[in-house]
């Protein structure tokens, strides 16, 4: 079975989506967060591809996908993923989502219960908050970048775009999010700077956050019919920690916990943990 990573493009929901595939067998869909792309799964894909077909898109507006002006709420982005899976001809999939990709994964599973059979979440909750609820001050301080990016996305876009390298270098190496400052190599940082320097990319990313504070809160408040598929939810011990309680609000069958000595970027900080956990969790689907 091949572990070669192949790049593709397809017209999905009216825009050009870039995605990669590898391996063969039962399909697993890997959904990245911000400021990342399919590349965040680079250390995970080869091992998973030995037993599964791996599909890792650049989600709407990020990576090498096109940058549309609208559609950045996570429910719409989940329809992008559904259309990609349909384009590829699959009728059953397992899903792994990290960061905002975890929220997209939630709506993908929630709205497509006959399609998604298992859900693996990494350091993300279903949505930032339900409409009408309030952020506890300690949580708001920990995730303060969310309010910078999403509170006034046009202003944030203008400021970040002045020096994408400076901003992302700080974002990716600070101990605010990582257990270690050495998670990302210079090559890794350069790749994330490259894709986030493409025209429209920073705007798209800030819109991910803006909708997270607006449309997504309304959608989450309406998501009252719990998932019944198996869900595992693991947060980094030095960022969100044990995220099971948040997922138990939207799913009946949740396991997981906190990944020790790990921050937010779990697929890149602890790739072997992700590999081992995914292979065990998705094994019944093979």
Curated annotation (Swiss-Prot):
Q: Which residues form the AB hydrolase-1 domain?
A: 26-123
Membrane topology qualifier: Peripheral membrane protein
- A Pfam cross-reference name: Abhydrolase_1
Please list the GO terms describing molecular function: epoxide hydrolase activity
Enumerate the InterPro entries for this protein. Answer: AB_hydrolase_1, AB_hydrolase_fold, Epox_hydrolase-like, Epoxide_hydrolase
Q: Which reaction does it catalyse?
A: an epoxide + H2O = an ethanediol
Enzyme active site: 99 (nucleophile), 209 (proton donor), 264 (proton acceptor)
Per the record's keyword annotation, is Mitochondrion included, yes or no?
no
SUPFAM superfamilies to which the protein is assigned, alphabetical: alpha/beta-Hydrolases (SSF53474)
Q: What induces it?
A: Expressed constitutively at a low level. Induced by cyclohexane oxide and (+/-)trans-1,2-dihydroxycyclohexane.
Q: State any GO BP term from the record.
A: catabolic process
EC number, as in UniProt: 3.3.2.10
Which keywords appear in this protein's UniProt record, sorted alphabetically?
Aromatic hydrocarbons catabolism, Cell membrane, Cytoplasm, Hydrolase, Membrane
Going by the record, the broad EC class of this enzyme is hydrolase
Q: Name one GO cellular component term.
A: plasma membrane
- Kindly give the Gene3D superfamilies that the UniProt entry links to this protein: alpha/beta hydrolase
Subcellular location per the Swiss-Prot or TrEMBL entry: Cytoplasm; Cell membrane
Indicate whether Cytoplasm appears among the record's keywords.
yes
Known function = Involved in catabolic degradation of epoxides. Shows highest activity towards C6 and C7 carbocyclic epoxides. Also active towards linear 1,2-epoxyalkanes.
**Which family, according to the similarity comment?**
Belongs to the AB hydrolase superfamily. Epoxide hydrolase family.
Record's subunit section: Homotetramer.
What is the protein's given name? Soluble epoxide hydrolase
Q: Lineage of this protein's species?
A: Bacteria, Bacillati, Actinomycetota, Actinomycetes, Mycobacteriales
């Amino acid at each position: 079975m091949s572990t070669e990573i192949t790049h593709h493009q397809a017209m999905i929901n009216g825009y050009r989506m870039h995605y990669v595939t590898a391996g063969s067998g039962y399909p697993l869909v890997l959904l990245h967060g911000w400021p990342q792309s399919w590349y965040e799964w680079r250390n995970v894909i080869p091992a998973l591809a030995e037993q599964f077909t791996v599909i890792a898109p650049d989600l709407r507006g990020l990576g090498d996908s096109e940058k549309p002006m609208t559609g950045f709420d996570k429910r719409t982005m989940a329809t992008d993923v559904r259309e990609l899976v349909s384009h590829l001809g699959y009728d059953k999939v397992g899903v792994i989502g990290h960061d905002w990709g975890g929220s997209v994964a939630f709506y993908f599973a929630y709205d497509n219960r006959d399609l998604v059979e298992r859900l693996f979440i990494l350091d993300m909750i279903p949505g930032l908050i339900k409409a009408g609820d309030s952020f506890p001050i300690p949580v708001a301080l920990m995730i303060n970048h969310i309010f910078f990016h999403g509170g006034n996305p046009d202003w944030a876009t203008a400021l970040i775009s002045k020096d994408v390298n400076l901003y992302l270098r700080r974002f990716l190496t600070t101990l605010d999010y990582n257990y270690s400052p050495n998670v990302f190599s210079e090559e890794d940082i350069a790749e994330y700077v490259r894709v986030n320097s493409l025209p429209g990319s920073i705007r798209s990313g800030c819109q991910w956050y803006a909708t997270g504070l607006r449309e997504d809160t309304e959608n989450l408040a309406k998501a009252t019919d719990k998932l019944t598929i198996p869900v595992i939810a693991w947060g980094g011990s030095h960022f969100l920690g044990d995220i099971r309680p948040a997922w138990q609000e939207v799913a009946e069958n949740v396991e997981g916990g906190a990944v020790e000595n790990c921050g937010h970027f779990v697929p890149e900080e602890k790739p072997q943990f992700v590999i081992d956990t995914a292979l065990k969790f998705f094994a019944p689907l093979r």
